[in-house]
Amino acid sequence: MASTKINGIDLNIKIKGNGKPLLLIHVLGGNQEQLDIVATPLSKHFKTITFDIRGHGQSEKPAEYTLQDHINDVLGIMDFYNIEKTYLLGVSMGSYIAQGVAIAAPERIEKLILTVPKSNGLTSSVQMLFEEHAEEIKGKNFHETILTLLKYLVYNTEIMQHHLDVFETDLTPEQFAAANKALTNFDFRKDLPNITAATLVISGKYDCLNPPKDGQEIAKLIPNATFAEMQFSGHAPIYEETERYLQLVEDFLLK
């Protein structure tokens, strides 16, 4: 793991394995370690590149930044490591960034995997969930809030109680607010038809944050896209159905 200055910001980047590059982007409020459950096995086939996006994990945390900054950072990482073309995988917020990258530089994305995505939003899906259930979570800390709302996030709450860190954050309230603000008013729908990469869109059947209809919409708008629905997952298929998820990803990337 190394801190590297990209676009004037120190980003914490980890590279593992050999083969074709596969860049993975994590969720809102999270960090790259949450992707280890899939990045580690995938590193047997690919050179996996994970990083803490700006404002997250061990990367630098500016007071303000935008979704475009995240997009530029991915392209900056590719430039820094002389990666002309890559496989790109994004999860939740990471899928928003991945869509932006594939639109901005379609010639640089060989294959694209969008996990529990949406193509547009007034704010983050997590923030919307908090607002919808404001009375239910009133007075609760972040951990208590996640426990209360877990039934809206996943299919099997019993299994996911062992992986609560997927939805929790080590950001301060101010840092989390900045991360949410970066996702204000984005809409990729008119530009999705310009994506040229073969694309796999994966949604969880029981996802109340970014439901399958959001993934299906994206798959219809991207010319060379296929849609897969995880039957026993909510918003965390990489944890809820890890083996099935890896099989889908490996089959798609290795074919």
Predicted regions: what they are:
Residues 233-246:
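Catalytic histidine-centered segment of alpha/beta-hydrolase-like enzymes
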Residues 123-125, 142-193:
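Conserved alpha/beta-hydrolase catalytic His-Asp/Glu region
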Residues 99-104, 110-139:
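Flexible "cap/lid" loop of the alpha/beta hydrolase fold
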Residues 40, 49-89, 247:
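Active-site loop/oxyanion-hole signature of alpha/beta-hydrolase fold enzymes
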Residues 90, 94, 98:
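Gly/Ala-rich beta-loop-alpha elbow adjacent to hydrolase catalytic centers
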Residues 195, 201-203:
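Short beta-strand/loop motif that positions the catalytic acidic residue
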Residues 9-60:
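Conserved HGGG/HGGXW glycine-rich cap/lid loop of the alpha/beta-hydrolase fold
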